[in-house]
Amino acid sequence: MFKSMAIAAFSLSSLLVAPLASANWQVNNEQSKVSFVSIKKNSIAEAHHFKKLSGGLNEQGQLKLMIDLTSVETLIPIRNERMTKLLFETHEFPNAILTADLSKTLATLKSGQHVLKGLKAELDFHGNKKELTIDVLANMSPKGDVTVSSLTPVIINASDFKVTEGISELQKLAGLPSIATAVPVTFSLTLDKEK
């Protein structure tokens, strides 16, 4: 479906929003969502999502999102089971972990203000890590909660994470002529400011 990056030094202008530096935020699972689309038979697209997300954003602007792969929801129980066992292999890789440096975003984010960034991130999925560049929309509510959403889908290629064999297994079991190995992923995260 994220090589640690050095924390960017705040510019002089970031001192104007220095109070943010003392905050921590936690992912609100109920108000957050990570979704992906699978395409079978070349043209049949189906949307799926994960029901359990956790993680947070610390005062240095480092984001960590943990996706519980056992919580995949495709609306078909047998497909959920096959994905967890054959594709994700959750007995060995129960989570996908996305890390990103939001320090520059936090430095310029004010209450109610939206900031678009080409965010550098790293996805750790199925024992493999890959750097990603994500376009995001960020917002801070008047009470200090932060939302971070994908502006465009993030394309995850199965070959980058060595899950093409799992896709082939799913294809055989379902009797399908094809399942796409490039998957668009979208996300919307709400991070509650700690009291």
Model feature map: region roles:
Residues 1-9:
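Bacterial N-terminal signal peptides that target proteins for export
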